[in-house]
Amino acid sequence: MHELAKNNFVCILVHMPGNLAVLDQNAADGIIEKYKEIYPSIQEWYMGGHSLGGAMAAEYVAKHVDEFDGLYLFAAYSTADLSDSDLRVFSVYGSEDGVLDMDKYRKYRSNLPEDTYEYVIDGGCHSYFGSYGLQKGDGTPDVALEEQIEMAVDFITYNSK
C-alpha cells in the first residue's frame, strides 16, 4: 500500500481483528462515506486484499457492488460471482506461490469479469504481498521483496490509466 500511495493512490487501511479480514467481514462499512468527505475529488473506489483478505474483499465488494469501481486481488481468488459486474478487477500472484491453491484459483476465475487484468509475477511468491516474512509452505522466490512489490505496483498503475 505504501508504494501505491507513492504513485498517487489514496490507500485506506482498515484494521482487522488479529489482522484477519474473516474475523470482521463488514469492517469496511461506512469507509467510503467517511472518506468521500475527506477526499471529495476521488471518483473511483477500489477494494483489495492479499490472500484471505483478498477473498474477503471480493465478498464485500460483491455485496456492495454499486459502491465500488474495482477490486485488487493479490494472491487471492473470489468465490463470489462478480462476472457480470462492471468492476475493473486486477489479479496479481507470483509464479512461485506455494500457498495459493491454483486449482481453486482456476476454478473461481470464472467468477471474475472476462476483462480482468491478470499478472503473474515471474519469480514472485505469496508471502511478499503481505511483507511478513516467508510463510510456511510458500515457494522460494526468485525476486526480491522490493522487486515484487514494484512489479505489482507498476502493473496496477499502468493499467489504471
Task: Describe the function of each predicted region.
Residues H2-L23:
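Conserved alpha/beta-hydrolase
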Residues A27-W45:
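Conserved acidic catalytic loop of the alpha/beta-hydrolase fold
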Residues E44-G49, F74:
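Short beta-strand immediately N-terminal to the catalytic nucleophile in serine-hydrolase-like folds
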Residues G48-A57:
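Gly/Ala-rich beta-loop-alpha elbow adjacent to hydrolase catalytic centers
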Residues D66-S78, R88-F90:
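A conserved short beta-strand
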Residues L100-N111:
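Short alpha-helix in the alpha/beta-hydrolase fold that links the catalytic acid
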